Amino acid sequence: MKNEINMSDVWKWAKDLFPLNRSLTGIGNLETLKYLKDIDNNLSIKYFSSGKKVFDWTVPDEWSVKSAYLLDSKGKKLCDFGVNNLHLVGYSIGIKTTMDLSELKAYLHYDKNNPDAIPYRTSYYKRRWGFCISYNDYKKLIPGEYKVFIDATHFSGKMHYGELLIPGDEPSEILLSTYICHPSMANNELSGPLVSIALARHIKSNKVLRRYSYRILFLPETIGAISYIHKHQSILESNVIAGYVLTCVGDDREYSYLPSKYGDTLADKAVRSVIRFIDPNYKKYTFLQRGSEERHYH
């Protein structure tokens, strides 16, 4: 494994991983983790079994989708999952039916504020189906009957995740957590896993950074962190002295920082000591504006 960070490598990783259909579970997640393991062989690929109780949550069934699309009355294929996996609402059930456009519209999702974009929708914990379409394409739908085809199944399987431990001079750990459950979306969330695996390479090449140990997690959002905490709570409480959630770190906007619930932890102090030099105009949120794994690690 090369230890230096080469941005052309990171760009290639992003292009290779972008097409995969990631979700809470499924082959896309496993393929993503295997790809990351090829970058750093120390990454361990593990899983939680469907149906496992984790606190008051339950690990969901695994989801597999082969194809999904609509056909209009002229035989034109629309919302083709094979062209863009965002077209299918995540965790949709399988269905094969015909319905009029007036009825179909209840199952279509679009965003008027971003008329050229295909929105991202999921239904992890309620069995239903749906398609996502750009608003401009939605307006072009012709009246008549549409064939609906979704070849998807739910079954008792596995929810995979990745864990990378980098030992330091001390057993005290820095926790880095990111998530692998979004399909073809770059900033949210290929950026987090790629920055995390690149950081692992950088940490290993820099002895100055090896005072503390590092625990880097690649999880399905929410249920992944909850499951991991359920299994490793005592280890985390004993070893972790600071932690960060890496999410939406791939755009060109100002740096942003969401403080901890307490606001004065080691993690807070470390960020504040450097971010003002990197970007004096950085954006600071409040913990009340949390939206990712920081909810669970607290």
Regions found by a protein language model. Give the residues of each.
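N-terminal hydrophobic/helix-forming segments and targeting peptides
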Residues: 1-298
